[in-house]
Amino acid sequence: MLLSDRDIRAAINSGELKIDPHDDQMVQPSSIDVRLDGLFRVFNNSKYTHIDPKQPQEELTTLVEVPDDEAFILHPGEFVLGATLECFGIPAHLAGRLEGKSSLGRLGLLTHSTAGFIDPGFTGHITLELSNTANLPIALYPGMKIGQLALFTMTSPAEAPYGSGTLGSKYQGQRGPTPSKAYLNFQN
């Protein structure tokens, strides 16, 4: 069941749902608006001949910090990693779904490629997979509204929530845009 604004506020006020920084004006009728952090991971296109998900490729991306009063310019066809300004703590009985903002989608901005699902138990900043599908560059400003997180009540709390240690949980506690750790899926 999708949480309403009333349910979202109750979960925040009870301490079940953690959001830092929290601004009550970000609570919408059935979601929480999320803002863009000033950290981005830009791909080093000349460093590797290809992307190999079996290999760590630690120099595949470079961390770039954009000051609050400046814009990061996302060029047509470009893909970068960003992150939410907010750090979340999702309880074991809730799951989340991150969606883009309609107004930005109408400009050609995609906020995620495939990773829009947020597991129960997740803590950290949500990494954004930002793509510009327009034919003009898009200016992205730290602090701007970039997406919205809808929260769903599960039929029962997860037995092994994300980060519990029984799962891989390789992105638990992430700060800022976190590069892929797909190579860990190939290890026994």
From Swiss-Prot:
Spell out the protein name for this chain.
Answer: dCTP deaminase, dUMP-forming
Residues of the active site are 129 (proton donor/acceptor)
Q: Which domain of life is it from?
A: Bacteria
Q: What GO terms describe the biological role, i.e. biological process, of this protein?
A: dUMP biosynthetic process; dUTP biosynthetic process; nucleobase-containing small molecule interconversion
Q: Which organism is it from?
A: Corynebacterium jeikeium (strain K411)
What family name appears in the similarity comment? Belongs to the dCTP deaminase family.
Entries under PANTHER family matching the protein: DCTP DEAMINASE
Q: What does the UniProt keyword field contain?
A: Hydrolase, Nucleotide metabolism, Nucleotide-binding
Subunit comment for this entry?
Answer: Homotrimer.
Reactions that this protein is recorded to catalyse: dCTP + 2 H2O = dUMP + NH4(+) + diphosphate
Q: Which residues bind dCTP?
A: 101-106, 119, 127-129, 148, 162, 174
UniProt site (Important for bifunctional activity) = 116-117
Its biological purpose: Bifunctional enzyme that catalyzes both the deamination of dCTP to dUTP and the hydrolysis of dUTP to dUMP without releasing the toxic dUTP intermediate.
Q: Which gene encodes it?
A: dcd
The root-end lineage is: Bacteria, Bacillati, Actinomycetota, Actinomycetes, Mycobacteriales
**Classification via NCBIfam families:** dCTP_deam
Its pathway is: Pyrimidine metabolism; dUMP biosynthesis; dUMP from dCTP: step 1/1
Q: Please name the top-level EC class of this enzyme.
A: hydrolase
Q: Which HAMAP family match?
A: dCTP_deaminase
